[in-house]
């Protein structure tokens, strides 16, 4: 069985397209879909109950955040394979079947994602990432990565120097689509939880990828197939607030995994503060008021 876990937050407008794109049977396996709704008052629950009665709908008592809600959905799931999926995605059966077959026949793969394509046809760069070095982070914040996207010296953060249609191992993938075996998620879990609930919204996917890799598994991007990611529909659009939240969450991931010494903690705090301030300074110069895809 494949279990699909979706965390919804003010997702009434896009959840229908997401659920409508999901099969109930895939490669001979039954598919169960679980929606954990962090904002049950927006009407998404009524839509799901009326149009998708096969979906297991869980109304959260409050906004649990991304990681905690995913953990609740995971606990309710039964599948040998589990897909964590965003509500602002539109999937297709060939892409799902391809990724599932790759996972089924290669036990070294811990997590896999297809290419994620945005509404304008461009690639969602966050669907394949490195575990960035300090230099990679500076290049992205300072705009060098976007200015020289095909140069490996500057493009290490989002790996834009690699072919979009290729298949290769990466450092991290996006929480919008994370497919893995239950045995892998259980092996990478901390205190019985797949996602670290200290990360309310951002950084949790990076943290999980690091733990899966530490458990001895590969993180794979397969660009031969693609799904649509209507990025940002379920989150706030204020550039400053979101940028600060992303940088601060990723800083905390680095402190968790790489900040064993006082010197390392000082280094990462300083680096992430610099990256955040440089990125916000560039945004103000360009007059951004809405979130750019990253």
Where are these regions (language model features)?
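Short, acidic, metal-binding catalytic loop of nucleotide-sugar glycosyltransferases
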Residues: 20-30
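Glycine-rich, basic loop-to-helix element that forms the pyrophosphate-binding segment
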Residues: 59-77
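Active-site-adjacent helix/loop segment of glycosyltransferases
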Residues: 210-292
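Conserved donor NDP-sugar-binding/catalytic core segment of glycosyltransferases
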Residues: 90-126
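Short, flexible, basic/aromatic active-site loop/helix in glycosyltransferases
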Residues: 131-170
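A conserved acidic beta->alpha catalytic loop
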Residues: 21, 37-46, 62, 92
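Short aromatic/hydrophobic "clamp" motif used to bind/position activated sugar donors
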Residues: 82
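A short, conserved alpha-helix in the catalytic core of glycosyltransferases
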Residues: 163-226
């Amino acid at each position: 069985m494949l279990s699909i876990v979706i965390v919804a937050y003010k997702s009434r407008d896009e959840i229908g397209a997401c659920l409508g794109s999901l099969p109930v049977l895939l490669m001979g396996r039954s598919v169960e879909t679980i929606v954990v709704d962090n904002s049950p008052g927006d009407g998404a629950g009524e839509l799901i109950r009326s149009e998708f009665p096969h979906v297991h709908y869980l109304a959260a008592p409050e906004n649990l955040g991304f990681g905690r809600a995913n953990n609740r959905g995971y606990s309710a799931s039964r599948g040998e394979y589990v897909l964590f999926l965003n509500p602002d995605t539109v999937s297709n059966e060939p892409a799902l079947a391809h990724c599932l077959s790759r996972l089924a026949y290669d036990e070294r793969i811990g997590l896999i994602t297809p290419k994620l394509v945005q509404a304008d046809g461009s690639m969602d760069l966050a669907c394949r990432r490195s575990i960035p070095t300090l230099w990679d982070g500076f290049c992205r914040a300072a705009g060098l990565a976007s200015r020289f996207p095909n140069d490996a010296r500057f493009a290490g953060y989002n790996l834009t120097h690699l072919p979009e249609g290729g298949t290769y191992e990466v450092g991290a993938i996006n929480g919008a689509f994370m497919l893995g075996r239950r045995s892998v998620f259980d092996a990478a879990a901390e205190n019985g939880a797949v996602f670290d609930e200290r990360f309310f919204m951002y950084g949790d996917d990076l943290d999980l990828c690091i733990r899966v890799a530490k458990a001895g598994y590969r993180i794979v991007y397969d660009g031969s197939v693609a799904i649509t990611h209507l990025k940002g529909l379920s989150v706030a659009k204020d550039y400053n607030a979101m940028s600060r939240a992303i940088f601060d969450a990723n800083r905390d991931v680095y402190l968790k995994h790489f900040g064993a010494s006082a010197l390392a903690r000082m280094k990462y705090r300083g680096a992430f503060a610099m990256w955040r301030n440089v990125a916000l300074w560039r945004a103000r110069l360009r007059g951004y008021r809405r979130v750019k895809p990253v």
